[in-house]
Every structure is written in structure tokens, then in C-alpha cells.
């Protein structure tokens, strides 16, 4: 169980919390070319020995439980911020559970259709890593402008997280 606790602590250490009420909790760890956060967890059942989670999906699993997340299939952002991991059990949550068709309707209604295609697959690992670092830097600068009080590290799980560990 100590390992599980360390995984949760490692996850929340990569989250910055906006100080304004209702602000996003931004993932500042690894970021994929699609703009979503990535988080790796050891998984002995995986061929690679670890499993990659999207950061918002991992946060939702910690908060809502794996059965609910698996049943819903999709974790959708109300805030339209792919780096937001603010999953809470109350109305202040920025993430909600839904199905694929609901997620596609929301995405189209908000004009967030994927226009960049799969060009990132043709880039080297070093190029993708450099892009990730540059994107993270731009996101943090933008977030600091959007959050009047700035950002503070969220070093531990929010009170709403029940202690469930995937």
C-alpha cells in the first residue's frame, strides 16, 4: 500500500491549483502532442511494465472510482481545458463522466474538433519532448495570466478524494 500512496502523491505533486474560486487545477507534468496530460503508473500486467494514463482520467478515477469511470467510458472537461484535472464530487468539479457520443456532441458544440491530425507521429522522440516542454511553459504563462491570484502547488490529494487508488 505504501507504493500506491506514493503514486498518488507523485500525481498531485504535478498539479498547480489556481487561487481564484472555481479555477482550474492544471497538470504540469508530461504533456502529449494532443495537449492532454500524461501520467505513468507501474503495471505488472502491461507488456511495457507501466501504463500511461491521461492525467484528467487518472484524477477522475481517484475521485469517482474506477468502476464509475469505466462504466461511463469518457471523462469530459466542462472547462474545455485539456490540462485541467479538477475532479471533485460536488458542483465545483471541472470533469464529468459521460459516453463517447455525449463527448463528441460537447466537443462539436464548443468548436474543439481535432484539426492537427496525426502529424506528431512522424516526429522524433526528442522533437516531441521539446514540444512538450515548450507547451508546458506556454500553458503555465497563460495560466498565470488567467489566474489573478496566481497558481499554487497542489501537493496532496484534495479532500474530496476518498483515498481510492487505481
Show which residues each predicted segment covers.
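Short helix-coil boundary/hinge micro-motifs
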Residues: 1-52, 79-80, 134, 145-166
Amino acid at each position: 500500500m505504501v507504493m500506491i500512496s506514493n503514486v498518488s502523491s507523485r500525481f498531485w505533486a504535478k498539479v498547480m491549483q489556481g487561487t481564484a474560486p472555481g479555477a482550474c487545477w492544471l497538470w504540469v507534468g508530461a504533456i502529449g502532442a494532443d495537449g492532454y496530460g500524461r501520467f505513468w503508473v507501474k503495471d505488472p500486467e502491461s507488456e511495457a511494465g507501466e501504463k500511461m494514463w491521461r492525467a484528467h482520467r487518472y484524477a477522475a478515477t481517484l475521485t469517482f472510482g474506477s468502476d464509475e469511470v469505466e462504466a461511463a467510458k469518457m471523462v469530459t472537461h466542462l472547462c474545455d481545458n485539456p490540462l485541467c484535472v479538477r475532479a471533485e464530487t460536488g458542483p465545483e468539479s471541472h470533469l464529468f463522466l459521460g459516453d463517447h457520443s455525449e463527448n463528441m456532441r460537447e466537443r462539436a458544440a464548443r468548436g474543439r474538433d481535432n484539426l492537427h491530425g496525426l502529424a506528431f507521429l512522424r516526429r522524433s522522440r526528442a522533437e516531441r519532448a521539446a514540444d512538450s516542454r515548450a507547451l508546458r511553459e506556454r500553458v503555465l504563462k497563460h495560466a498565470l495570466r488567467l489566474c489573478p491570484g496566481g497558481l499554487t502547488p497542489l501537493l496532496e490529494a484534495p479532500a474530496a478524494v476518498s483515498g481510492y487508488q487505481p
